[in-house]
Amino acid sequence: MAPSASNRTASSWHFAVRDDRRLENQPAGDNLDLLRYAGQGVHPMVSPAGCQRGLFLALEFFVNDGQQVGRTELTWRRWGRIAGPLCALAVYFLFQPSISAFSVPAGASQRSAGSPASSITAPQQHAERTRVTAALAVWIAVWWITEAVPLPVTALLPLVLFPGFGVVRFQTVAQEYANKYIFLFMGGFMLAIAMQRWNLHRRIALLTVLSVGTSPRQLVAGFMLATAFLSMWISNTATTVMMLPIGLSLIELFQQKTDLSGSARLEQSFGVCLMLGIAYAASIGGMATLVGTPPNALLAGYLHQRGILIGFAEWMFFALPLAVVLLIITWFLLTRILFALPAVDVSTAAGLIRAEWKKLGPMSRPEWLVLSVFMATAAAWILRKPLANWEVLSGHVPLLARVDDTWIALLAAISLFLIPSDLKRGPFLLDWEAASALPWGVLLLFGGGLSLAAVMEESQLARWIGSQFAEMGDLPVFWIVAAVALTVIFFTEITSNLATVSALLPVLFAVARGGDLDPLWLLVPAALAASCAFMLPVATPPNAIVFGSGHIRMGAMVRTGLWLNVVAAVLIPLFVYFCAQHFLPFQQSNSP
């Protein structure tokens, strides 16, 4: 049995979340080793899907005291395995698209043919391909939503189903698993692993907290700021795992020795506020960059398929202000409205943070080198486009016109394998043993989502969906954007955000085209909203991790998360409607 919240000392709380391979077919009681105590280290990169499923089981242990662990989820998965094929059959027999919607331009049939059987160019053949594609897409979506099998396994289904049923050739599907934005995310992951390997992320976090202040409100602000900044570059889950033991040390300090004259209620409020602040800041910070969270990179990759390019700097200039505003509102709600922390100083808190800082010692050579690579990479991402557009410089340095964000990310990743941490005897900044901890499942999810979108386009299913929304263009754009954001925010409370975005992007793109809207009006709010699931522990791995600390009750998380869901549902449409056109490559405004 796990120790009670009152007996959990700060030094004993170090989470090590296993890869999802260890979670499958494992006895329920064994899932307790998801939460390891006694100062054990943290795995450098955590699989979000595995973390979410594993922590769901661990949290259910806390709630049910070890009885009937995981039965609900296991039942949900079993039904999902059956429901996927059954729903596919139902869609195939019930979906009867009009043949007139599939007129084929002369000379286009051979290019779009997906298999030898599809060489017949009659509209009936295209209607049949559309029916099959719709059925198989529903099968994949159901398995993603229910997690009937591990999400990366479902992401491999397009490679089997679509060529197997003669919809497209294997090459058409497989090429999407090598999209350049998958390699952008891979490079970002390797940079994050190097930061974690040499403890640079911990130093940045402690320095940020020390710089903000030591009153309860300032401490929450410092933790949220540090968490949000790190999650811009590092996995949201790994950032939360790293920040949690520091936060729990601070909560323990409040319980043992406090300079405040308040009651135990104040200590409890501070603990809840700090834990929620860490979880929410991890999700919010990831919104700010393309490498901060998988839905952002998936959006960029999908748009790249359609000839719409979003650069790292363009996204950051648009999304960073949104993340900052949402972070400030979240801090204000937590510390002033919902939990009302006092503004008095707690001198012993500063001593605790300084003690943790001193344990790190002076910055080592590897830390300086990793920091240099990180800063150079971030600067290159931000300055690449302005420098390439500077005719005087680009004329003398033609390389500027040839590189892109993925090239920069891979160059940075490769350099980490070439720069020694010690010129005489030390290892390199990154080796393959450390780099192999990459969340390969997330990269497969990218490929699965992009391949599904490509097949929907190739089979004309996306075109048919768009034709059903031809009248949508008459509606006010703002309310369309708001409806998309609101739907995705609450939908991702119960489903994986990456799986949700993978399934919705091709549908929303088709809807936008059918309604004569620029696709960015629908796709951008969907990607942003996927990071704003704040209500339930199972909504995101950061939520699950802090809920498992024992300092948060379900009611407190639901109540606080509902406030933030509403705030995000208002902020995202406002930012997209009034700001996105100034930074992102809109081709048509559709605005008044």
Give a label for each model feature.
Residues 36, 139, 146, 152-265, ...:
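Membrane-embedded alpha-helical segments and adjacent helix-loop junctions characteristic
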Residues 82, 133-137, 152-156, 220-225, ...:
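Hydrophobic alpha-helical transmembrane segments
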Residues 86, 90, 137-141, 160, ...:
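Generic alpha-helical transmembrane segments of integral inner-membrane proteins
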Residues 141-149, 226-235, 279-290, 417-418, ...:
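Transmembrane alpha-helix interface/packing and boundary motifs in multi-pass membrane proteins
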Residues 180-190, 232-243, 316-331, 401-411, ...:
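Alpha-helical transmembrane segments
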